[in-house]
Amino acid sequence: MKILVAILLALAYCSVAPVAQAGSAGAGLMQAQKEAEAKGFRLEGNREEIIAKAKKEGGLRALLGFDKPTIVALRDGFRKKYPFINPHFEEHGNPAESQRYLLELQAGRTSDWDIVNVLNEGQYEYASYTEKIDLRAMAEQGVLQIPPKMINPESRNVIALSSTVDAVAYNKKLLPPDLVPKTWDDFLKPAHSGRKLLVDIRPNSIAGLVPAMGLEWVESYARKLAAQQPVWVRGHTRYLNAMAAGEYRLFFGTYYHGVMRMKNRGAQDLEVLIIEPVPVRLTETHTIVKGARRPNTAMLFLEYVASAEGQKIMWDVEPFKSSIYSPGSKTEELARGKKISLGDWEHAMKQPVYMEKLTAAFGFPREEKK
């Protein structure tokens, strides 16, 4: 008899528990909707309704910060998933292009774009021209299948679809094994002084150390690095090519994905170093444009890029780029088990301040043209 009662109680719990959980989830969504509405934000509570509205919209126009092959691959994958949508994408990754589009918006020029690439340091300037859709809450409530940390918790509507891992490059034929740096302090050794080291005048890579080391430490380090009398450069691809050709031996603070791309293309003398704490920054930030005619389709596309399929496309095609916040992504795997200096949203918003202070610590250098 006791066994029968226990079974009946267990069955009763199993039937009631899902209802209670659903009620709890529903209450959470209702509360999120109230909070969003109080801030003037829209929050869709049903993914099926988003899809139904996207079917009526039928298309999507986006200015994306990815390379063209990636854009094509994402477009094809998105169309396969949602065959009723006809997307039109254009490459928009150049900072000058982003600034020019912002000036057009500020001048009152009308736009038919639904999604735009936004520079991290330009988020405040773009804020007035973004659609007030609470993507963060929709991700937290499971309406959109997006890792919530990919979305800015302050603006609620800007998403970082990728992360950049800052690394070090060297030519293995030119740099002896015993001089290969193992720590950040190793770059300050006499062996690397006197124009034996490339350093970018734009200090975004060294700024990536601030979250782990603190701004004061990084400013001091920047002054010591400048005292090494490096070759000051601007940009990476041209100098990585020169390094692969045997012109330089060591590049401080370049991009992991940039070095790996070149190795894939045959630059086998190049090697990449991941030094802890590893600077990782949120990049490929995008938002839905204010007044977008196809906001529901825009939400579905951002969700698609944030998905495992979209992240794999970026790693394979971009290549070597994905979000550290995407579980199981290659970037998350690369960072796993290492001490990370994570430039999260709080630090991303302070990036302009870091850049200004570190440029001063460098001594306001200029690129040394040949």
Where are these regions (language model features)?
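Short, low-complexity disordered leader/linker segments with a strong preference
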Residues: M1-K56, E368-K370
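Extracellular/periplasmic bilobal clamshell ligand-binding domains
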Residues: G328-K370
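A bilobed periplasmic-binding-protein/Venus flytrap-type ligand-binding module shared by bacterial periplasmic
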Residues: A169-L174, V210-A212, L282-T297, V305, ...
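Extracytoplasmic ligand-binding site segments that recognize negatively charged/polar headgroups
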Residues: R61-D76, H88-E104, T110-E247
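A ligand-binding cleft/hinge motif common to bilobed small-molecule-binding domains
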Residues: G122-Y126, R249-D269
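Periplasmic-binding protein-like
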Residues: T164, H192-I201, A222-A226, V231-V233, T237, Y304-G328, ...
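Short, polar/charged alpha-helical segment
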Residues: G26-M30, E44-K55, G65-N86, V168
